[in-house]
C-alpha cells in the first residue's frame, strides 16, 4: 500500500474520532444544548476558554489538515476511474479544509480578544463576540456544511 493511502486512512480515522470527541465535548462538557442566550454563550467561552481553544484546534484546524491529506489520498486512489470528477472533488476538499482551518484559527484569535476585553468591558466583549462568531461561522460553513456536502457527493 502506498504511503499516501496509509496517511489518508489515518486522516480519515482522525476525522471520525475527532467528531466523536467533539460531540461529547459540546454536549457533555460545554452543555451547548442548554445555552439559549448570547450572554450565556459569552460566559461559557470565558469560563472554559482552554476547552474551547483545544476544541477549535481539534475540530477545525487539525481536522482541516487531515481533510487535505484525505482529499489527496482519495484523488490518488480514484483518479483513473473519473479524473475530472476527482479533480473537482479534490479542489472542493482543499477549499473546505482551508475554510475550516481559517475558522478555527479566527475563533481562537477571537477568543483571546474577548477574554481580554471582558475584563475591561463585558458589554463590548459581548458585541465583539457576536461579530467574531459571525465571521467564524461563515468561514466554518455553519450554514449547513455546503462544502462538506458537495465534497461527500
Give, region by region, the residue ranges found by the protein language model.
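Hydrophobic, aromatic-enriched alpha-helical segments typical of multi-pass transmembrane helices
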Residues: 1-153
